[in-house]
């Protein structure tokens, strides 16, 4: 604050710019990160980008049973859902401090 209780707009704008740059950098890092999820004790693995794009799907031949296609489908869905949950957790951990947990010094309620 400036003398007389005035806010220093230049300082506030600089802080906002720094926060925006930090968020953009964190978003870029998250988008480039790949996360692996698994199901069936690791017999089915899904690798996704943190943005949600599936990159790879690995299925151990042990779980391929022509008589139990539904079981394999469940494992694939489970592996993808596990990877998505991990990606969401990663994003929350990296963006959490930048998104809403912080405050703007000198501004009440922020």
From Swiss-Prot:
Record keywords: Cytoplasm, DNA-binding
A Pfam family matched in the record: YbaB_DNA_bd
Cellular location(s): Cytoplasm, Nucleoid
Family matches, as SUPFAM superfamilies: YbaB-like
Signal peptide, first to last residue: none
Disulfide bonds: none
Similarity remark: Belongs to the YbaB/EbfC family.
Described purpose of this protein according to its UniProt entry: Binds to DNA and alters its conformation. May be involved in regulation of gene expression, nucleoid organization and DNA protection.
Subunit architecture: Homodimer.
Protein name per Swiss-Prot or TrEMBL: Nucleoid-associated protein NFA_2940
